[in-house]
Design a protein with these regions (language model features):
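Sec-dependent N-terminal signal peptides
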Residues: 4-13
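Bacterial Sec-dependent N-terminal signal peptides
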Residues: 15-30
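N-terminal substrate-binding region of glycoside hydrolase catalytic domains
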Residues: 26-93, 97-99, 115-138, 224, ...
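Hydrophobic faces of well-ordered beta-strands that scaffold small-molecule active sites
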Residues: 34-38, 73-75, 105-109, 153-157, ...
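Aromatic-rich peripheral "rim/lid" segments of glycoside hydrolase catalytic domains that contact
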Residues: 47-49, 266-296, 303, 307-310, ...
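Short, acidic/polar
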Residues: 48-66, 136-146, 206-216, 296-300
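Glycoside hydrolase catalytic-domain groove-lining segments
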Residues: 59-62, 66, 191-197, 212-282, ...
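Active-site cleft segment of glycoside hydrolase catalytic domains centered on the general acid/base Glu
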Residues: 87-92, 96, 117-220, 232-241, ...
Length: 360
């Protein structure tokens, strides 16, 4: 009789232990970057956006992400933006909050007042009157000043600088000036704190070996690559090969600095989505489903955390960008179908792909 009574208790204890194991926090290797870019999060919080776990319980997003093994947060910085978002004030405040949760800070200098990418590298308005020599001084002093406020763990000097930065002076067509301006920014970082790791960031992987040849005399630590199948090709094998070639050629650790994948091609507001067509996907391996998104990031993780090949980690871009302004917003999220949370702001399975298991 006692055995019969004890059996349900034993089953309950086993079930509890299974749930406990499933919900255990993940601690990833500290010498890898397992990151998310949360640059839009302060704006979302300001507009009262909220998030839920897969049990429909409201969560503290920062604690939740940390518990899932994410150890680094990437933040973009604009020089003099039109509002407070991505400003030095906002980024300083947010980075201090992130440090309280134990995150490392990856600071992404755009050296512009707005988005910098291969198509647009506009000089900040404050530097519009500069000649080349004065621009060198401005970049050095600005970089040093920002670091005195934030003191990050990683500094990205420029964003997707395939064609240069701070145009026209730093255009790749004037490669010696471009290289000298990058070198000036890197020296500002080294002279402030030589423990900060410096990254140079290239969009894609095709042509990257030739691009980084320009910077063999520059003192930096990491090569960052953006990888989105829409723009950078649908062959993950080619990505893997080119990352290995970069490491072998230049001896730098390689990071996938930006990536993302859709869990659906539907929309949750009235704002045009950047990714919305099947032709932009890697099919049939990775459909726009929750499972397809998970499988894609698992493969990115496999490629980017193989430290034998000099690979150092990855960062998911826009994971927080739910349709936080409501489903009628014309100025809402262009990325809600690539977020880490579904259209009810509930955590998707992909969130568990950030944890590096013993088998990875």
């Amino acid at each position: 009789m006692i055995r019969v009574l004890l059996l349900p208790i034993l089953i309950a204890l086993i079930a509890c232990q299974c749930r406990k194991n499933k919900n255990n926090n993940c601690t990833n290797p500290s010498d890898m970057i397992i990151g998310v870019d949360l640059s839009t999060y302060p704006e979302i919080v300001e507009d009262h956006g909220i998030y839920f776990n897969d049990q429909d319980e409201e969560i503290n997003l920062l604690q939740f992400l940390h518990d899932k093994g994410i150890n680094t947060v990437r933040l973009k910085l604009w020089h003099s933006p039109a509002n407070e978002h991505a400003s030095l004030t906002e980024v300083t405040t947010f980075s201090n909050e992130l440090k309280e949760y134990g995150f490392k800070i990856w600071l992404d200098f755009h050296y512009s007042d707005y988005w910098a990418d291969p198509a647009d590298q506009t000089l900040p308005n404050a530097w519009a009157v500069c000649n080349y020599e004065l621009l060198m001084d401005s970049i050095y002093n600005y970089t040093h000043h920002v670091l005195s406020k934030i003191n990050p763990d990683y500094v990205q000097v420029g964003n997707e600088i395939n064609h240069g930065f701070v145009h026209p002076f730093g255009h790749i067509n004037q490669v010696e000036q471009f290289k000298a301006l990058i070198d000036t920014a890197c020296k500002a970082v080294r002279n402030y704190n030589n423990q900060i790791e410096i990254m140079l960031h290239y969009a894609g992987h095709e042509g990257a070996v030739q691009f980084f040849n320009h910077f063999q005399s520059v003192d930096y630590d990491l090569i960052g690559l953006s990888y989105y199948p829409k723009w950078h090709g649908k062959s993950l094998d080619s990505l893997d090969i080119n990352m290995n070639s970069l490491h072998e050629m230049y001896g730098k650790d390689i990071v996938i600095a930006e990536t993302a994948y859709p869990f659906t091609l539907d929309w949750n507001d009235q704002t045009h989505n950047v990714i919305g067509l099947e032709e932009q996907l890697i099919l049939p391996d990775f459909p726009a489903t929750a499972q397809g998104q998970y499988d894609f990031l698992e493969e990115i993780k496999r490629i980017s955390t193989n430290q034998h090949d000099g690979n150092y980690g990855f960062c998911y871009w826009g994971g927080e960008m739910i349709a936080w302004k409501g489903n009628q917003a014309l100025d809402g999220s262009s990325w809600e179908n690539l977020a880490l949370f579904d259209f009810q702001s509930k955590a998707l399975p992909v969130i568990d792909a950030f944890c590096i298991s013993q088998d990875d």
